[in-house]
Amino acid sequence: MGNILSVALWVAATDFRTFLASRVVGGLSEGNVQLAMAIATDISDDKQRGATMALVGACFSIAFTFGPALGAALSNVTLVQSNPFATAAGFSLFLIVTETLYLYFCLPETHVVSSTSEKEKKADDNKKTTTQRTNSHGLLNFTHLAFILFFSGMEFSLPFMTYDLFSYGSKDTGRLLGFIGIVASVLQGTVTRRMHPLRVVQLGVVSCLCAFILLARLTTEAQLYGAAALLAVTSATVVTGLNSLSSFEASASERGNKLGNHRSFGQIGRTLGPLSFCSLYWWAGRDVAYAVGATGMLGVVALAFGGLRKPVQV
C-alpha cells in the first residue's frame, strides 16, 4: 500500500515538494525485492539457493531492460500540462495496483507455521548447521554496504556523464540501460545460476572495478557500451551472490530477519552513494570521481577475495 501511495503522489505532483514526498514514502515502504528474496529462500534448499536467487535477479533484470525504455517513451506523452510525467506515473500506478492484487489473491504463504515439536526439531537442526557457517553477517552486511555505496553513486552519475560527453537524451539513456538489462538477464539465466555464490560475487566486483577504470577514461560510445557490458555483469552477480551467502548463514526461522538487515545496509549505501558521488563528480570532475570510485571498489574486491569464504555445506 505504501508503494501505491507513493506513486499516487507522483501522479498528482505538480510541485517539487509533492514529488519529494512521493519519493520519501516510496523509500519507507520499499520491500518488494526483499519479499521476493525471502520467498526464494523459503522455497529452496542450500543447493538450490544460488540458482533460485539468480532467477529472482533475472526477473529484476528483465524489468530493468524494459522499464527505463518504457518510462522514457511515456515521458514524451504529456496529458497533464502541470505534470509532464503524469502518463509514466499513471502507468506505474496501474502496474503496482495489479501487483498488489496479485500478491493478495494469488500468492500463497511460503513460510509455513510449524507445530511446537517441529519447531524444536528445526531449532536443533539449525544449531547444528549454523556452527559450520563461515561468513559473519557483519562482514556480509559491510561488504554489501561498501559495494552499493560506490556502485549506486556511479550508477546515478551515468546520465550526467553521457550527457556531457555524447549529449544523450532520455531515449539514448533508455537504450543504454536497456542494453545493461538485457545482458544482465541473459547472464543470470545462464551463468550466475550455475556458479557458486562466492565466485559470483568475486566476478561481479572485479567487473565493476574494470568498469570504473574504463568510465574514467572513455571517449567513444563503443567504449561506453563496453563499460556498460561490464556493469551488466556486475548487476547480474554481486547483489544476488551476497543475498545467497547471507541466507546460508541464517537458520530458517531467522532468515527473513537476516536478509532484511542485509538489505537495509545496502539501502544505507544507496542513500549515501548518489549524493556523495554525484557531488564529487560535479566538484572535482569525471576523472577524479571515477578514480575515487575505482579505489573504493578495489577495497570491495579485497573484501570479496580476502574476507569472504565459501560456506562449508555449499
Where do the language-model regions lie?
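Short amphipathic helix-loop junctions that connect adjacent transmembrane helices
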Residues: F156-T173
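Transmembrane alpha-helices of Major Facilitator/SLC transporters
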Residues: T173-M195
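Hydrophobic core of transmembrane alpha-helices in multi-pass small-molecule transporters
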Residues: S6, R17-G31, Q223-T237
